[in-house]
Regions:
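Feature captures hydrophobic
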Residues: 1-122
Length: 122
């Protein structure tokens, strides 16, 4: 599974999400299995999603999960424990590490940003 430009378009075309994240300026690491992506956000808009090739490059914080976990989270109607980042965190389905201050300060923004990759059908 790779993160696609489609996800970036969904995020950047969601005016409510952009308004909510207008003060977010950072890069965070999003992991799927053994692959990490650096997601750069400028004023709430995703500027780039790049595969991390050097382990010395990292984001302010990192969210990591297995491919099956993200696939379940991104269903139109996710099953119990996969519907929300914190539910997934509580069940140890995902890992969240690093400086969590900007994540918590902009919690709804990041939850909606990640959920915006949901499919339109199951």
């Amino acid at each position: 599974m790779q993160l696609t430009d489609t996800w970036m378009v969904r995020i950047n075309s969601n005016q409510d999400l952009l308004k909510r994240g207008k003060w977010v300026n950072l890069t965070f690491t999003f992991g799927i299995e053994n692959t990490d992506y650096l997601i750069e956000i400028i004023n709430g808009k995703v500027n780039s999603i790049k595969k991390r090739v050097l382990s010395t490059k990292s984001g302010v914080f990192r969210i990591h999960g297995e491919i099956v976990s993200w696939e379940k989270h991104w269903l139109k109607n996710p099953p119990r424990d996969y519907h929300d980042i914190f539910a997934m965190l509580a069940k140890k389905i995902i890992i969240l590490e690093g400086d969590l201050t900007p994540f918590i300060q902009n919690l709804q923004y990041f939850k909606d940003l990640i959920a915006s990759n949901r499919t339109s059908n199951d």
